[in-house]
Amino acid sequence: MLQLPVFAALPVQNVGLSVPSGIYSNMSHMRARAMNKSDFEFLYSLLEEESFDKDRIKMIRVACIGNYFTSRQCASMLSLLNFDSYRLEALEYLAPRVIDKQARDVILKEFAFVSNREKAEALLMGQKRR
């Protein structure tokens, strides 16, 4: 069972956004940083402790608030889910928070079926799931 007090212990990282100096700041130059290794290991251990995929997805959803992830971190979290349908559901929350989408192959390998890999790639490219 998901316990909300657990989330109070979940670190919400300063995303480290930097805005170029000058009169005009182009927002496209802002860059987020992925969750650091120790915080991610803590999150991963919390996810491992959950018994049900639905509870893991809820925790992933909360972890996405204020945090960013590498493709490898995203794939690690998806690997804890038992079915592609749950992986796709979790990826809906994770995809906008992945900072290195050019390395998406590591994420796509977590999907057993080609059709689901295609859906996952669409999510990573910013398309909504139907």
How should these model regions be labeled?
Residues 2-130:
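General marker for long, soluble alpha-helical cores
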